[in-house]
UniProtKB/Swiss-Prot annotation:
InterPro entries xrefs: AAA+_ATPase (IPR003593), ATP-dep_Clp_protease_ClpX (IPR050052), ATPase_AAA_core (IPR003959), Clp_ATPase_C (IPR019489), Clp_protease_ATP-bd_su_ClpX (IPR004487), ClpX_bact (IPR046425), P-loop_NTPase (IPR027417), Znf_CppX_C4 (IPR010603)
SMART domains in UniProt: AAA, ClpB_D2-small, zf-C4_ClpX
Binding site for ATP: 121-128
Native organism: Brucella abortus (strain S19)
Protein name per UniProt: ATP-dependent Clp protease ATP-binding subunit ClpX
Function (record text): ATP-dependent specificity component of the Clp protease. It directs the protease to specific substrates. Can perform chaperone functions in the absence of ClpP.
A single GO BP: proteolysis involved in protein catabolic process
Molecular function, one GO term: ATP-dependent protein folding chaperone
């Protein structure tokens, strides 16, 4: 029979969680087994792990290959809008599964992979789409930051480190790693720094693009299991990158002006009406993206050629940001409501408050990424005061609170005095 301890007792008899090492005084509950103890926090963590496992199994169809609709349905639960980008990713991941299944059959037709480029303004959900994909697929998946990469032999991360991380995600199972998916973020930051490549060696721009070419196309990479620079004597693992799907993403600041300039040249005549880039939303401009625009931006032709599928994401308007605040399973409002619920307080946002928060994010041009910092600033004083206040049962946030012209409204629970009179 397990015993539950609520703390108390002298220090000699203090019990500790066998998993995290916290004492019974640091946690709310400590559950005793025959020889071990586990605290309520570790139980919560175990439940989260099991929930994640259940999510992964949800997207498998009976044949073992999730359909594009199944993948998109899960993406819809977490990512608002960006329908076109989600369709592209869903089809790409589905085809990746099918190609892997096809590899095991003897066939004279070789299925080539189609790497993907995601283009969209900052804060529109490129990275979040990749993070959500990582949770729902059952092949090794890693995210790499292009800004940390340098050409081999220079200070920084080698391109081979990407394959090493994938190998680690596959628990050093080479077969599984060779069937994985790699997301390279901030790929726009490795654009060529100058139109004249002979001026100076561009080790973090064009040099990285050149280094990425082979592993994206398909090559056998020699990967040091412990990192090559610190352990030069170790044996190398051979990883074939032919079947690894690469997804690249970037904000490509300034690309909209390159696209618009091309459009202005082609739209000449008495009936031509051309909106300037300032009059159009960036996402609208990105829909007209052509490979030649990426070349002018600074990507080399060979690199653009390795990314045959281009998906553009739209910038988020006020309505979309309000949806992001409230609708996804792990929406920001739900997260803060859960935090307040731990203090037994209900957090309520008025509709005008949500729109005011969304408007601020649009003004800052930070997209969904800026929502959390705005929420933190609004709720900071409340979160500071709340643990020491007694009787608060509800906190109400209105549009005036977001604008800074009012304080959050605290609603207290009714209390009875000794004579039975009720007071707020």
């Amino acid at each position: 029979m397990s015993k539950v301890s609520n703390g108390g007792g002298d220090s000699k008899n203090t019990l500790y969680c066998s998993f995290c090492g916290k004492s019974q005084h640091e946690v709310r509950k400590l559950i005793a087994g025959p020889t071990v103890f586990i605290c309520d926090e570790c139980v919560e963590l175990c439940m989260d792990i099991i929930r994640e496992e259940n999510k992964s199994s949800m997207v498998k169809s009976r044949e073992g290959v999730p359909t594009p609709q199944e993948i998109m349905a899960v993406l819809d639960d977490y990512v608002i809008g960006q329908k076109d980008a989600k369709r592209v990713l869903s089809v790409a991941v589905h085809n990746h599964y099918k190609r892997l299944a096809h590899q095991s059959k003897n066939s004279d037709i070789e299925l080539a992979k189609s790497n993907i480029l995601l283009v969209g303004p900052t804060g529109c959900g490129k990275t979040y789409l990749a993070q959500t994909l990582a949770r729902i697929i059952d092949v090794p998946f890693i995210m790499a930051d292009a800004t940390t990469l340098t050409q081999a032999g220079y200070v920084g991360e080698d391109v081979e480190n990407i394959i090493l991380k994938l190998l680690q995600a596959a628990d050093y199972n080479v077969e599984r790693a060779q069937r994985g998916i790699v997301y390279i973020d901030e790929v726009d930051k490795i654009s060529r720094k100058s139109d004249n490549p002979s001026i100076t060696r561009d080790v973090s721009g064009e040099g990285v693009q050149q280094a990425l070419l082979k592993i994206m196309e398909g090559t056998v990479a020699s990967v040091p299991p412990q990192g090559g620079r610190k352990h030069p004597q170790q044996e190398f693992l051979q990883v074939d990158t032919t079947n690894i799907l690469f997804i690249c993403g970037g904000a490509f600041a300034g690309l909209d002006r390159i696209i618009s300039a091309r459009g202005e040249k082609t739209s000449i005549g008495f009936g031509a009406t051309v909106k300037s880039v300032d009059e159009r939303r960036i996402g609208e401009v990105f829909k007209e993206l052509e490979p030649e625009d990426l070349l002018k931006f600074g990507l080399i032709p060979e690199f653009v050629g390795r990314l045959p599928v281009i998906a553009t994401l739209e910038d988020l308007d006020v309505d979309a940001l309000v949806q992001i605040l409230t609708e996804p399973k792990n929406a920001l409002v739900k997260q803060y409501q859960r935090l307040f619920d731990m203090e037994n307080v209900e957090l309520v946002f008025h509709d005008d408050a949500l729109r005011a928060i969304a408007n601020k994010a649009v003004e800052r041009k930070t997209g969904a990424r800026g929502l959390r910092s705005i929420m933190e600033k609004i709720l900071l004083d409340t979160m500071f005061e709340l643990p020491t206040l007694e009787g608060v049962r509800e906190v109400v946030i209105s549009g005036d609170v977001v604008d800074g012209s009012a304080r959050p409204l605290y609603i207290y629970a009714e209390r009875q005095d000794e004579k039975g009179n009720v007071s707020a």
